[in-house]
Amino acid sequence: MNGNELASELTRAFPGAPGDLHRLHARLAAAAQRDGILDVAYRTVDSPVGPLLLAATEAGLVRVAYASEDHDAVLQALADRISPRVLDSPTRLDAAARELGVYFTGRRHSFDLPLDWRLSAGFRRAVLSHLTEIGYGHTASYAAVARLAGNPKAVRAAATACATNPLPVIVPCHRVIYSDGRIGRYLGGPDAKRALLALEAAA
């Protein structure tokens, strides 16, 4: 049972005031973490590019997902790939939510969050690990990123790595475009990518 299913069950079992349900859920989440039965915590946050799902393990932030990816499908994928012990636990992601909030005001240019890279491997991981070298307000080409990752000929693979980045916004794949200026693929869609580039260009 994931966090959404648990919340539905709690609502049916305890049809009291929303505040009571929220406090009960918070206690259950804290107990699950204390007892080692919470492997993936998640929450959603509003943003100028739509609601974002944030998910974290003990190692750090493991997933950021746009609404267009279907948050329920993302949670199921996390349950399949990491652990079925997934729970809506907002406090575990307070720091990430705060940093994203400041980023979207234009006052934060980088993130200081521990990251869990387990959803990336090989050349894809190498590509993503270099993206923070692209400065805020700047862009780089897929060809340049392929060179940074150690394989100048792997431009298409670099583009695929950026397009499937499990940590968009935090790991700034939106700063990578084609050499001819085309925007390229993006998990959140082209409008979200343009919005992030415009935000950074204006700061």
Region roles according to the model:
Residues 1-152, 201-203:
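Basic nucleic-acid-binding alpha-helical/helix-turn surface characteristic of O6-alkylguanine DNA
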Residues 55, 185, 198:
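Short beta-strand-to-turn element immediately C-terminal to the catalytic PLP-Schiff-base lysine
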Residues 153-195:
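Short glycine/serine-rich loop segments
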